[in-house]
């Protein structure tokens, strides 16, 4: 999590935009995102150059030699943040407006790429050289503080804090999945170098970015020393859809900044007939929106065949089952109501997953996980698409701590179940003998069937009560009499003092 000092610095950056006349949170976050992307291009270009040198691979810097922008050819080094941030305000503004911004819009010549789709209509909106100069100085200070914190999540945490401004403004109702929860889900699924990964409600591409980072960390040599696997990683592995173009633009830049050149990020209503995907993906990672009900006419008919409902959280589960290949896996976040809802649609989708697919795990999370943006209680469902059943014993885990306080402050604390969750999930043989009073335990499929496919952990968890021994009744009564006598004595003394 980011420090209070860093939050204050981001708030100050936001105030610079407001003072310059940019007050729409969506516009502000777009402009900040562009500038962060320009800053990160410089850093990531340097990192890639070093990585290529270490691996003995050739690398062509995007800033090397001369760069053509429109009809003009300029020195590419002037496009680097580390160079132009020292320019006088007027010159910096001119370079940014005339060179840097047009340059980032043309980084991908492939007009079908995610980056090109969502940068084509990007506009540089900072009004004056003075505002740009102040914003660049402020971002330099923010990056300096981020580097001092030196945690892998700090950049993502800054992004989350920026996105919280949208939520606070009441626009779009955006709130992000915490990065440590995303990372936990990715580690549990342990994606391979051959996965085809999809998030049908991708937002800023958090799950896709985390999957890419995990693969680079765990399977770097396997992917980057194999031409076909590297091509798959860069161009075919990652698929994300959303209905918010601002989020898609941020998501596309987020992916590219993390070294994924050409993810398939597309504007799409995943629940409508506009989405043709079927039996396509090997892994779905998602935290779909729980925004209530949809217009039934806008929902794809085949999703309603599994469970006839207007509730998005149920329809997305139906969608996951449709878009997964046989053998494909899913880890998704659902509101608690999905686990125990008594409507026919709730029971139908749970029955479908338990009876016709293979439900593997239900991880109950505390309601504070999404604070300060939302207080909803949620759980993680993990299942595999089989179309012929296979559910045996289902693993339940009762998460009570995630390393942060569960209030609005979300301050770091020592208690953290996440390492234990990952360890236990990856070693199922050790789980079979656990009692239902433990943090985790197995529940046979038949127990779930007998309970109307209820998947809430409290339905199966047992509480161990410790017997309390009280003294005999006569002893308690004697103590009460003694207390009464003491009270009477004190009352007599008080009356004497008051001359009553």
Question: Model-found features: residue ranges?
Answer:
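Conserved S-adenosyl-L-methionine
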Residues: 172-286, 291-295, 301-302, 310, ...
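Short acidic (Asp/Glu) and glycine-rich catalytic loops that position anionic groups and cofactors
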Residues: 11, 137, 231, 261-265, ...
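Conserved nucleotide-binding/hydrolysis micro-motifs of P-loop NTPases
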Residues: 42, 204, 246, 272, ...
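Non-catalytic, mostly N-terminal accessory regions of nucleic-acid modification and defense proteins
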Residues: 1-193, 264-275, 364-368, 391-405, ...
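Short beta-alpha connecting loops at secondary-structure transitions
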Residues: 236-239, 268, 299-305, 364-366, ...
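C-terminal, active-site-flanking charged/polar segments
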Residues: 358-359, 371-421
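Hydrophobic alpha-helical scaffolding
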Residues: 148, 201, 240-244, 283, ...
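Conserved Class I SAM-dependent methyltransferase catalytic core
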Residues: 28, 32, 243-250, 265, ...
